[in-house]
Amino acid sequence: AALLPFPAALGGHPLVACGHSMGAYVLTRLASQRPAAFAHLVLIDPVIMDPALYEGESATPIPAPPGHRGAGRRNAWAPAEEMRARFTDRAPYANWDPRVLADYCTYGLLPTADGKGLELACPPALEASVYQNALRTSPHEWLHYLSVPSTLIRAPTGERGGELDFSLSPTWTGLGPAIGAERDELWAEHSHFIPMEAPARVAGLLADLL
């Protein structure tokens, strides 16, 4: 609801909008409620799963974020170069375009409250909460209202090793037909982190729509 006024604040003309992962999930909800604000949606491996996975999840108790693996992420760095050096050879970051990883480490950190170091701009507990609640609100409740032309880009799917395994796609393979996507493409050589691994290819896709 907080984002509903956002498209109008950008000038009022229909937008070509792109979202990745949970960003694409949120974009579908926004576009379903503000269709006139959008000319085209580019949904890159959205965290929109098989409808059956959402059944009964809204009634499931929410575990405390510290019990989630995402809450245990390291959250103290100094300087950003330390973070980049640590991630360069670690999955999934090793497959990212080096420029993207450098930007992530530079702009994904903020000064700590005591000014003695840097911490993640997205607090680990908040990230954990997002994953914990991902199945509690089914996007299939609003997808049938989605009328904006769309392009869907997916990574290969399969049996994932858990909710934080993004070597494979979390996207429901039936999503393209369900929303009437004009293009439904499998980028088989990439993981869930398509924009980070192939920024130039994604940029070219967007440029063709502008």
What kind of region is each of these model predictions?
Residues 1-4, 84, 199-207:
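Short, amphipathic alpha-helical "lid/cap" segments that border enzyme active or binding sites
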Residues 51-118, 122, 126-137:
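Helix-rich cap/lid subdomain of alpha/beta-hydrolase
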